[in-house]
């Protein structure tokens, strides 16, 4: 196996200069750690992470360190697609807070590790709309329909069907570490 200095690998994996840091741990099998420790940014911010997931070989392990208040849904959905397609085994480590899109990212992982005092916050989408009246109504109807599909597809790991209905109706859910573990 080729020895790669950490800063050389970081240069290779961080082509945009400000993407999430990806750390490679040389071992018999490939092991990577990706930190999600700020707001979930625009989709292009995660190009290197998505590339890592889509090109990972079987036997590769990837750890997502999650401590974030959430962010862009389109980025979460891009990461989710790559998580569904990857051959790697991905573990989500809830380090402290997983809110909104960050909580959904945790639920998209294959395995979970929940730190003591970690918290989880679930809610539906936040957005704004503008334009002509009929256009705004069509957009709101579309986003409402899409949001329901996303909620039912992702939150089913932690919320019952009745709780999913309440979430869609506007209720927010907050869970502490012991509650998260019980539900997962």
Task: Label each residue range with its predicted role.
Residues 1-104, 108-184:
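N-terminal organellar transit peptides
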């Amino acid at each position: 196996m080729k020895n790669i200095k950490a800063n050389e690998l970081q240069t290779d994996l961080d082509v945009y200069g400000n993407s999430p840091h990806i750390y490679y741990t040389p071992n018999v099998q490939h092991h990577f750690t990706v930190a999600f420790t700020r707001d979930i940014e625009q989709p292009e911010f995660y190009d290197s992470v998505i590339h890592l997931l889509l090109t990972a070989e079987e036997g590769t392990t990837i750890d997502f360190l999650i401590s974030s208040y959430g962010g862009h849904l389109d980025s979460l959905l891009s990461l989710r697609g790559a998580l569904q397609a990857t051959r790697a085994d991905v573990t989500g480590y809830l380090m402290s807070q997983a809110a909104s899109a960050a909580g959904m990212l945790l639920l998209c992982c294959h395995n979970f590790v929940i730190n003591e005092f970690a918290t989880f916050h679930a809610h539906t989408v936040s957005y704004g709309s503008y334009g002509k009246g009929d256009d705004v109504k069509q957009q709101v109807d579309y986003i409402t329909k899409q949001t329901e599909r996303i909620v039912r597809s992702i939150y089913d790991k932690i919320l019952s069907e009745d709780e999913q209905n309440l979430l869609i109706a506007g209720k927010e859910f907050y869970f502490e570490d012991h509650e998260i573990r019980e539900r997962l």
